[in-house]
């Protein structure tokens, strides 16, 4: 499904339609990204300005123009935060008394990544009207991460894990540079210089402690029989089918089957007319996978994104939509039933893929209908809710995938909580985790937050680019990036394999996560640029394929406890 605008949201910038970048060493005036609040009451107070100091050595860009605010629960909210010549400023937090800010900042030696500044866990409050406060952005980012690492390290050690000398080296270096920055707080540039180094070491400390603790937990808990290694299975129709089945079954025991209405080539043939199914293509694939002992899940039967809704669905009245959804769900589950392990009830309906502009109440009603019909027809099939955009930056953009939002928007956490509170008894909460423009600690903290909702979880779609390939260079299909690298170093086969190993390790270590599904299987049929595990339909294995096979084999050999 390459080229879809929802996915460009992730791979281009972690936002959609945000515009240009900020310059490497000067702050350019940027258009305000926010739309006026529908509430007319004036909630503005004084202003806080976070001033960036460009101590980086490279050409940049070093700061992306989208910033957004989050509350004490790390939930985004629409504010008037903006970029201008002064820096990152906010003067209206919409009556949220305590908040943090989120920016994408280039940390040379680690990556160009989104980071939260939260005043070391104490959060920020706006000054009174007419007042202004100026803060050193570099220092605030460093302080916030160093202090969080202190608390996180203490929590991780409670189960008996002892951090290695490597972890403590990064922790201690970050603490020392933070202290140096604090001592120079009245010397903005020198303080920023120390803080930048402290932040770099703190980010490495964050990731090292999480991955090391995850490996400790994996050994401690022993063999798991309740975890699926999954992948999108469209490549069955993109390469020789026997080659696909041999290579797929070598590393995966779970498959994602696309039921999208429009926009995915051969896999767009499921409906010949509204609600009229043509199941043969998927039926063959599922049967072939079942013969190999691979379980399958339906995906994208209900995905209301601009890319993938035909005009007849886009123009459908709500009452007709309910009738259509009931019939399509009933016919699909009657036909496939227990051939499937799971059925995705809705995809990305948390106010991102909402091109039909459904109200929250309508979303709840539609989700309940699909869930209940699926349960009544095929009670043995698990029902899942799949969410994207884990940090919900779109809330600050006040937009759906292609349109202005007409209702207050919700994060995946808030949306899922709302449908649980409404009594919708789905089985599995799914969260996409394409490279989230966040470090690994942020990623696992977000997943731990979602786990508090009490549902078993899967990572539904996971992936990162694989860097330039012979094919992409020869055919100019993937341009060489002129921006700072995003994670550790520029994307290549080795970096892709490193990230895959780390995210699968974190997922496998958490008993509430029961699957991790890679997207995609083969290049050049990818979403993330060269993000497949095979170089081409001929089946040449990339380093990430070998790495995944190795870690799965290692975990399969763990003793049962």
Please give the residue ranges for each predicted region:
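N-terminal export signals
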Residues: 2, 8-31
């Amino acid at each position: 499904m390459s080229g879809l605008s929802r996915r460009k949201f992730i791979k281009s910038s972690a936002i959609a339609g945000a515009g240009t970048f900020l310059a490497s060493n000067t702050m350019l005036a940027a258009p305000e990204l926010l739309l006026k609040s529908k509430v007319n009451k004036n909630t503005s107070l004084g202003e806080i300005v976070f001033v960036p100091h460009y101590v980086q050595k490279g050409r940049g860009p070093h700061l992306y123009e989208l910033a957004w605010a989050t509350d004490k629960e790390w939930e985004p909210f629409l504010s008037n935060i903006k970029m201008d010549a002064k820096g990152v400023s906010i003067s209206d937090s919409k009556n949220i008394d305590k908040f943090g800010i989120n920016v994408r900042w280039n940390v040379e030696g680690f990556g160009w990544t989104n980071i939260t500044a939260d005043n070391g866990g104490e959060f920020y409050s706006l000054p009174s009207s007419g007042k202004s406060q100026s803060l050193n952005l570099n220092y605030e980012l460093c302080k916030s991460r160093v202090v969080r690492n202190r608390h996180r390290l203490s929590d991780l050690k409670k189960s008996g894990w002892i951090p290695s000398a490597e972890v403590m080296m990064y922790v201690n270096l970050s603490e020392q540079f933070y202290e140096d920055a604090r001592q120079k707080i009245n010397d903005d540039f020198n303080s920023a210089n120390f803080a930048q180094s402290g932040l770099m070491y703190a980010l490495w400390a964050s990731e090292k402690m999480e991955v090391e603790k995850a490996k400790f937990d994996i050994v401690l808990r022993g063999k798991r029989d309740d975890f699926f290694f999954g992948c999108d299975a469209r490549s069955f129709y993109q390469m020789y089918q026997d080659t696909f089945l041999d290579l797929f079954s070598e590393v995966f025991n779970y498959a994602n089957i696309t039921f999208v209405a429009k926009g995915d080539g051969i896999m767009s043939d499921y409906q010949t007319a509204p609600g009229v199914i043509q199941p043969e293509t998927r039926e063959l694939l599922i049967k072939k996978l079942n013969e190999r002992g691979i379980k399958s899940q339906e995906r994208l039967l209900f995905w209301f994104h601009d890319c993938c809704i035909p005009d007849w669905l886009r123009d459908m009245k709500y009452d007709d939509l309910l009738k259509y959804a009931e019939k399509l769900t009933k016919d699909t589950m009657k036909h496939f039933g227990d051939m499937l392990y799971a059925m995705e009830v809705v995809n990305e309906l948390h106010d991102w893929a909402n091109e039909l502009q459904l109200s929250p109440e309508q979303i709840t009603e539609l989700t309940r209908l699909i869930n209940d019909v699926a349960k009544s027809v095929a009670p043995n099939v698990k029902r899942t809710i799949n969410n994207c955009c884990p940090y919900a930056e779109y809330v600050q953009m006040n937009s759906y995938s292609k349109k202005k939002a007409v209702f207050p928007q919700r994060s995946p956490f808030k949306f899922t909580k709302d449908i649980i509170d409404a009594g919708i008894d789905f089985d599995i909460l799914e969260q996409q985790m394409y490279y989230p423009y966040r470090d690994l600690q942020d990623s696992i903290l977000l997943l731990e937050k979602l786990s508090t909702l009490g549902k078993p979880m899967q990572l539904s779609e996971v992936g990162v680019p694989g860097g330039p390939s012979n094919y992409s260079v020869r055919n100019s299909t993937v341009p060489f990036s002129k921006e700072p690298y995003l994670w550790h170093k520029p994307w290549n086969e080795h970096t892709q394999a490193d990230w895959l190993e780390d995210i699968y390790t974190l997922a496998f270590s958490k008993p509430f996560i029961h699957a991790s599904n890679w997207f995609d299987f083969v290049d050049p049929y990818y979403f993330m640029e060269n993000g497949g595990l095979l170089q081409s339909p001929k089946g040449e294995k990339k380093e990430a394929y070998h790495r995944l096979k190795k870690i799965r084999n290692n975990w399969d050999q763990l003793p049962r406890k």
